[in-house]
Curated annotation (Swiss-Prot):
Membrane topology: Lipid-anchor; GPI-anchor
Underlying gene: Tex101
All copies of domain UPAR/Ly6, residue ranges: 141-215
Covalent lipid adducts (GPI-anchor amidated glycine), residues: 224
PTM: N-glycosylated; by high mannose and/or biantennary complex and/or certain types of hybrid oligosaccharides; possesses different oligosaccharides chains according to its subcellular localization in the testis. Sheds from membrane raft by ACE and released from the cell surface of epididymal sperm while it passes through the caput epididymis leading to disappearance of TEX101 on spermatozoa; is essential to produce fertile spermatozoa.
Localization in the cell: Cell membrane; Membrane raft; Cytoplasmic vesicle, Secretory vesicle, Acrosome; Secreted
Record GO biological process: binding of sperm to zona pellucida; fertilization; flagellated sperm motility; regulation of flagellated sperm motility
Protein known as: Testis-expressed protein 101
Subunit structure, interactors included: Interacts with VAMP3. Interacts with LY6K. Interacts with DPEP3; co-localized on the cell surface of spermatocytes, spermatids, and testicular spermatozoa, co-localized only in cytoplasmic droplets of caput and corpus epididymal sperm. Interacts with ADAM3; co-localized on sperm surface. Interacts with ADAM5.
Job description of the protein: Plays a role in fertilization by controlling binding of sperm to zona pellucida and migration of spermatozoa into the oviduct probably through molecule adhesion ADAM3. May play a role in signal transduction and promote protein tyrosine phosphorylation.
Length: 250
């Protein structure tokens, strides 16, 4: 009789523990979006379906936005359950205007359906395309932002304050993402640092590679321009010596 009573108590305990585990499981919104948007702050809809997570997992929502002057905006957005990370809200501006802009927002939270941001109005507040009066007349750069690769990259005038042309390729993986984004344009950033040498955005990993030819071309032009007067000066000195064999003395 005592053994049966113990088994009964154990069964009740297991049922309560099982019910407690189910209660503890978190529900999160889940979606992955990769798109080009004209005005993501006003038009992007970030509502998603809900799924039950495994015990101990958190909710996360992460978005990365990249834009060049005169182009649409690339949006990479992810919502999911995650097993790693702690509760935190992060906003990072990797590259600031004028020229190219790259920013991200990330929210890791521990309550059911807490990754519930439905728009980017509070995240994307980038100024409108730079006015023509603020454009530099001396620098032009190929300009495009595209999913995959740029089919065309027209040469566009750069805004005052930009320092170089950027040409880079970003490869994303993780967080349900597997995508490549090509970016070209005027920027204030020096070198291959559109993402400020940061290799992760929320659950996504990032690999940034660049064409350094575009960084070197302006410098090569300057060197060539500085050497030309020297070459002409040397030729001017050598010219009388070259004429000596042709001179006849009486």
């Amino acid at each position: 009789m005592g053994a049966c009573r113990i088994q009964y108590v154990l069964l009740i305990f297991l049922l309560i523990a099982s019910r407690w585990t189910l209660v503890q499981n978190t529900y999160c919104q889940v979606s992955q979006t990769l798109s080009l948007e004209d005005d993501p702050g006003r038009t992007f809809n970030w509502t998603s379906k809900a799924e039950q997570c495994n015990p101990g997992e958190l909710c996360q929502e992460t978005v990365l936005l990249i834009k060049a002057d005169g182009t649409r905006t690339v949006v990479l957005a992810s919502k999911s359950c995650v097993s790693q990370g702690g509760e935190a809200v992060t906003f990072i501006q990797y590259t600031a205007p004028p020229g190219l802009v790259a920013i991200s927002y990330s929210n890791y939270c521990n309550d059911s359906l807490c990754n519930n941001k439905d728009s980017l109005a509070s995240v994307w507040r980038v100024p409108e395309t730079t006015a023509t009066s603020n454009m530099s007349g001396t620098r032009h750069c190929p300009t495009c932002v595209a999913l995959g690769s740029c089919s065309s990259a027209p040469s566009m005038p750069c805004a005052n304050g930009t320092t170089q042309c950027y040409q880079g390729r970003l490869e994303f993986s993780g967080g349900g993402m597997d995508a490549t984004v090509q970016v070209k344009g005027c920027t204030t950033t020096i070198g291959c640092r559109l993402m400020a040498m940061i290799d992760s955005v929320g659950p996504m990993t990032v690999k940034e590679t660049c064409s350094y030819q575009s960084f070197l071309q302006p410098r090569k032009a300057e060197i060539g321009a500085s050497q030309m007067p020297t070459s002409l000066w040397v030729l001017e000195l050598l010219f009388p010596l070259l004429l000596l064999p042709l001179t006849h003395f009486p």
